[in-house]
Amino acid sequence: MATEVAARLRGARISAQKARLVADQVRGLEVEKALNLLEFSPKKAAKIVKKVLESAIANAENNDGADVDELKVSTVFVDEGMTMKRIRPRAKGRADRILKRTCHITVKVSEGQE
C-alpha cells in the first residue's frame, strides 16, 4: 500500500531550468540518500529542494504516520511560475528587460516497495 504525500513550494526565486537539474538527481531515491545528496550539492536549487523534501517527509510522518526509513522520493517536478519583469537602463536612453523567473517545486514521497 503506497500512499503518496506531497509538499509544494510556489514562487521559488530560481528559474525552473536550474531547479530541474537538481530535481532530476533526487527522483526515485530513498529519502535518506536524497537528503544527503542535496546537503552536499553546491547548487542554490539544492537548498530549496531540500527544504521541500523535508516538508514532504514531515507531512508523511505527522499526517499519515509513515515510517521515515521506508520513504522514497516517488515524484519531483518543477513548473514555471510567474516571471517578474524589471528594467536595466542602458546607454543613449535605451533599456533592457530583465526577467526574474520563479518556479513551483512539488515533491511527493511514498512508502512502499515498488
Swiss-Prot record:
Alphabetical GO biological process terms: translation
Family per record: Belongs to the universal ribosomal protein uL22 family.
Ribosomal protein found in the keyword field: yes
Organism encoding this protein: Alcanivorax borkumensis (strain ATCC 700651 / DSM 11573 / NCIMB 13689 / SK2)
NCBIfam families the record matches: rplV_bact
PROSITE patterns, A to Z: RIBOSOMAL_L22 (PS00464)
Pfam families for the chain: Ribosomal_L22
Function statement: This protein binds specifically to 23S rRNA; its binding is stimulated by other ribosomal proteins, e.g. L4, L17, and L20. It is important during the early stages of 50S assembly. It makes multiple contacts with different domains of the 23S rRNA in the assembled 50S subunit and ribosome. The globular domain of the protein is located near the polypeptide exit tunnel on the outside of the subunit, while an extended beta-hairpin is found that lines the wall of the exit tunnel in the center of the 70S ribosome.
Statement: the UniProt record of this protein carries the keyword Ribosomal protein: yes
Descriptive protein name: Large ribosomal subunit protein uL22
Keyword set, alphabetical order: Ribonucleoprotein, Ribosomal protein, RNA-binding, rRNA-binding
Subunit architecture: Part of the 50S ribosomal subunit.
A GO cellular component entry from the record: cytosolic large ribosomal subunit
GO molecular function: rRNA binding; structural constituent of ribosome
